[in-house]
């Protein structure tokens, strides 16, 4: 059985994300100024719209990595084959297809090249007893810009 936590953050151990070198509101202000000066903004084309509004991925990190429920459409369907686990998310019909291996070492050795950035990152899985462990790296930077839980480009979620 797991442990009760007050935070999704496990590193640092106190569960508190360190302060940003530059406060987020300053970054948002700079982003607004850039939009104002260049004309590139919410009305300039679909690329400027949020990913969920473009139906590329669901909002609220429903499909992960770090799968978080939202107020509605939080149903997940798990499909398991001998060498894959698929997690189908009701919100925006996102799907995570996770290859599974005999061990963590084998899983990590079979990762996709970093140049292949995918929505929801590169996930591999293995079983420890009857527990499925999923490790995700190489999360698409564009997806990271709109996350509620910040993750660095070199971050890893297990």
Question: Across the structure, where does each feature detected by a protein language model lie?
Answer:
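PEST-like low-complexity, intrinsically disordered acidic/proline/serine-rich tracts
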Residues: 1-158
């Amino acid at each position: 059985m797991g442990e009760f936590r007050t935070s999704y953050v496990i590193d640092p151990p106190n569960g508190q994300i360190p302060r940003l070198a530059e406060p987020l509101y300053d970054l948002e202000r700079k982003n607004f100024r850039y939009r104002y000066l260049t004309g590139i903004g919410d009305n300039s084309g679909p690329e400027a719209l949020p990913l969920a509004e473009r139906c590329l991925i669901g909002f609220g990190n429903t499909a992960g990595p770090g799968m978080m429920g939202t107020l509605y459409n939080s149903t997940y369907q798990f499909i398991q084959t001998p060498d894959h686990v698929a997690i189908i998310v009701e919100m925006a019909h996102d799907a995570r297809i996770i290859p599974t291996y005999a061990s963590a070492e084998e899983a990590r050795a079979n990762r996709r090249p970093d140049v292949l950035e995918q929505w929801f990152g590169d996930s591999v899985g293995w079983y420890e007893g009857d527990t499925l462990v999923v490790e995700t790296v190489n999360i698409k930077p564009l997806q990271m810009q709109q996350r509620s839980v910040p993750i660095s480009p070199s971050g890893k979620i297990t």
